[in-house]
């Protein structure tokens, strides 16, 4: 790894930044508390960026990059971190988007996540748990914390399928097998087919990115495993719709029946800038209850939203409830709460205490 790049990566770690952006004939930038900030005296000519990129890539990565003009991979940087790289071209020039992955797997508490409900989900022996959100919302960290909890608290075989491998897990009470796409398996679906012969108790799917993978994931759950995965969806109802739509229309009723029986929890998250410099997650949480299972089966998204609003006892809440809580706590300002809200009016009523809930604007 080029010395100049190591220095830049050290800057990321020392400043607790989440990522680094490098492009030719420009200063490098870090992403700090959600915002892009230039690194002083870091101007890099195009040729130097190209040398950096090629020094990081192995033969396989270079072959993929030269064929597709983009490639993902992860690298260790000696003792100060692990990094996920995306090398790509723009206007014919090589650029790098690099995300920091801590060497230590964070706990739920360190991530400011609701540990009680996530531990309860993680303790499930069979079913489907989904963590969803847009790129950069913290999905990978949340799943890593869940896998780490399982690894420390039950005996079994954890199989992860990732593109690329990010957090590194070591055997504890479980043995952990980590597969990387393009290195250990050609695809998610191929890995899931092979997984049934590898005796896993828990399967982590890095991303349910297309209908074929979604169908394979549901099939894996039906054979008796606990399956965890991520999706790029913004809320619970969109997640359920995306899963159902992965199947032919004539199977939708049957799929809803399957999902009502198989889903153990859905966690949708967003990272928000806080009043004090930093970021906090806001979560929408769905937990499998008899009422939730019935509403999934009957395809009643509006009623499902109300069930989450009224499901605090089970650990459920909507995004707007999470935002109102963060605002009342003083963690985020009103502008942030309103801009991230599903219903800005509902947020205002909740903050002012009108009717004591969000129901008044959702009837």
For the regions a language model picked out, list residue spans one by one.
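Short, flexible helix-loop junctions that flank or precede catalytic/ligand sites
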Residues: 1-363
């Amino acid at each position: 790894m080029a010395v100049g790049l190591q220095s830049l990566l050290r800057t990321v770690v020392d400043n607790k930044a989440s990522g680094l952006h490098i492009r030719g004939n420009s200063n490098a930038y870090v992403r700090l508390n959600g915002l892009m900030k230039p690194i002083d005296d870091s101007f890099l000519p195009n040729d130097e960026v190209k040398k950096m990129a090629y020094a990081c890539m192995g033969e396989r990565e270079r072959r993929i990059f030269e064929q597709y003009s983009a490639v993902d991979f992860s690298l260790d940087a000696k003792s100060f971190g692990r990094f996920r790289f995306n090398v790509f071209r723009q206007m014919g020039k090589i650029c790098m988007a690099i995300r920091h992955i801590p060497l230590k797997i964070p706990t739920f508490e360190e991530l400011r996540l609701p540990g009680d409900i996530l531990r309860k989900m993680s303790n499930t022996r069979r079913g489907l748990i989904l963590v969803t959100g847009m790129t950069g919302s913290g999905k990978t960290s949340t799943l890593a914390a869940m896998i780490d909890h399982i690894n420390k608290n039950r005996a079994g075989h954890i199989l992860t399928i990732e593109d690329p491998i990010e957090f590194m897990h070591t055997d504890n009470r479980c043995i952990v097998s980590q597969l990387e796409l393009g290195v250990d398996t050609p695809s998610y679906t191929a890995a899931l087919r092979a997984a049934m012969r590898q005796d896993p108790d828990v399967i982590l799917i890095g991303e349910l990115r297309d209908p074929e993978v979604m169908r394979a994931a549901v099939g894996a759950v039906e054979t008796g495993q606990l399956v965890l995965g991520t999706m790029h969806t913004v809320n619970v109802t969109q997640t359920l719709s995306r899963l159902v739509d992965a199947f032919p229309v004539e199977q939708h009723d049957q799929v809803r029946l399957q999902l009502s029986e198989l889903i153990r929890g859905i966690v949708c998250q967003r990272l928000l800038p806080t009043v004090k410099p930093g970021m906090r997650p806001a979560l929408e949480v769905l937990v499998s209850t008899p009422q939730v299972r019935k509403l999934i089966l009957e395809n009643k998204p509006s009623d499902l939203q109300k069930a989450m609003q009224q499901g605090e006892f089970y650990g459920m809440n909507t995004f707007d409830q999470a935002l109102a809580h963060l605002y009342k706590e003083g963690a985020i300002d009103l502008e942030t709460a309103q801009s991230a809200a599903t219903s800005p009016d509902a947020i205002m009523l909740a903050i002012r205490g009108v009717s004591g809930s969000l129901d008044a604007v959702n009837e």
